[in-house]
Curated annotation (Swiss-Prot):
Key word Protein transport present: no
Modifications after synthesis and translation: One or more lysine residues are methylated.
Gene source species: Tolumonas auensis (strain DSM 9187 / NBRC 110442 / TA 4)
Molecular function (Gene Ontology), one example: structural constituent of ribosome
Function according to Swiss-Prot or TrEMBL: Forms part of the ribosomal stalk which helps the ribosome interact with GTP-bound translation factors.
Protein name (Swiss-Prot/TrEMBL): Large ribosomal subunit protein uL11
Length: 142
């Protein structure tokens, strides 16, 4: 028989650096999950990713206080900022442009995000990423 799910917890944790401090500790503690067990498992699973990259994670907590978790790819905004070499997007994206990204960079980001995106092909996913880039104040070239 399948275990009964008691909660889903969605967090964004830096890859390779999960620790019991907020936001991880309080979110897991209120559901009775072993926090250190999660931190060790998460850090082991994300050790191949770029250290410090924000990694969305969905934790499924079961009624017996056991858990499973699924990691996602880093947010498009993080990947776009890294590709453009900027620290933050524009506060006025329609007026102030803060950087440039090429079509090749968009395709590379779309390949990275492919498991978490919907879309018929890589080109459609790249167009979606291009929309995110424009809303951050980046100029899309090509």
């Amino acid at each position: 028989m399948a275990k009964k799910v008691s909660a889903y917890i969605k967090l964004q944790v830096k890859a390779g650096s999960a620790n019991p401090s907020p936001p991880v500790g309080p979110a897991l503690g209120q559901h009775g999950v072993n926090i250190m067990e999660f931190c060790k498992a998460f850090n082991a699973r994300t050790e191949k990713l770029e250290k410090g990259a924000p990694t969305p994670v969905v934790i499924t907590v079961y009624s017996d206080r056991s858990f499973t978790f699924e990691t996602k790819t880093p947010p498009a905004s993080f990947l776009l900022k890294k590709a453009a070499g900027i620290t933050s997007g524009s506060s006025k994206p329609n007026k102030d442009k803060v950087g440039k990204v090429t079509h090749a960079q968009l395709l590379e980001i779309a390949k990275t995000k492919e498991p978490d995106m919907t879309g018929s092909d890589l080109e459609a996913k790249a167009r979606c990423i291009a929309g995110s880039a424009r809303s951050m104040g980046l100029v899309v070239e090509g």
